[in-house]
From Swiss-Prot:
Gene expressing this chain: tuf
S-S pairs: none
Protein family per UniProt: Belongs to the TRAFAC class translation factor GTPase superfamily. Classic translation factor GTPase family. EF-Tu/EF-1A subfamily.
Enzyme class: hydrolase
Region (G1): 19-26
Location of this chain's protein in the cell: Cytoplasm
Subunit-structure text: Monomer.
GO molecular function, one term: GTPase activity
Name of the protein in its database record: Elongation factor Tu
GO cellular component term, pick one: cytoplasm
Domain tr-type G span(s) in chain numbering: 10-205
Amino acid sequence: MAKEVFQRTKPHMNVGTIGHVDHGKTTLTAAISIYCSKVNKDAKALKYEDIDNAPEEKARGITINARHIEYETAGMHYAHVDCPGHADYIKNMITGAAQMDAAVLLVAADSGAEPQTKEHLLLAQRMGINKIIVFLNKLDLADPELVELVEVEVLELVEKYGFPGDTPIVKGSAFGAMSNPDDPEATKCIKELLETMDNYFDLPQRDIDKPFLLAVEDVFSISGRGTVATGRIERGVIKVGQEVEIVGIRETRKTTVTGVEMFQKILEQGQAGDNVGLLLRGVDKKDIERGQVIAAIGTITPHKKFKASIYCLTKEEGGRHKPFFSGYRPQFFFRTTDVTGMVSLEGKEMVMPGDNVDIVVELISSIAMDKNVEFAVREGGRTVASGRILEILE
């Protein structure tokens, strides 16, 4: 069957659901998908099972990798990332967050904010998301007096992490909306959420004029066609027939893009902000991996050593309880990759939780790197610092 061509009739935005495990992120994503398929006859409804689609996730009932679905409202075309909330899988949340322009933070009304609520807010802020909407879920299970307290608590938390104090809160039951798609009362919260998204989120400024760059999130082999790399276009534009370079982790190599697709539809060209699959000529599945970047030729180079400014989280923010010294070896998360690196402190003996400090880092493998790129620092399954590259040393 021939694939249809993607029609760019509405502005495109990447939005995601974030929040603590079991607060209802995937249920909300499914409820939105089902609601939009009722309103817009062309849309395909995805049930909870379709979004949580790895066997291990079904068994544990949690989302591991970020999942993508698409839907349209009156004014926008959304690509929606369902981000994992489970602690071990927060690294996938980082790559999910790196693809989002705005986020919906889920908080269960019956339990309030939890540790991962804070970690996700911090990561969202570090990944450059500047507006969120709070969805207060499981309203049917919560004591009405408690709900007011949870609202106040969540807004305080949202402000603490640098988001606006007038961040909108939508209340409802995602499970109710998902289970009763034909009941207007049950789906009212979804309608309200989508209207709030259309009106409150700012359309991001896309870097279309800069040289093309996409961070590889996943790689597939399609029989008879070749290798497809997927990810979000960070900047620039890509067309079929364009020559590109695959940079980072391994030797840099050149290839030609022979196809561009988004949500199984053919794109005339992919542009900044699009989540796409690129078909690459003469590249074997084993020759390319998550964490590399595909870029316009000669526009980005791989490096190991850089100087950065970092902020170390306090114990209360879920960071380290003790200082670290030169020789500290945590994981550094850039775009879609994590690499171990060694920290050197200059003119300072140690770094305390809560400090803002400049450090020098040497990674164990080269990755595609440019100035001002932000990263997260993690150890033992938690985020301990966030930073930005000041200069590349070698």
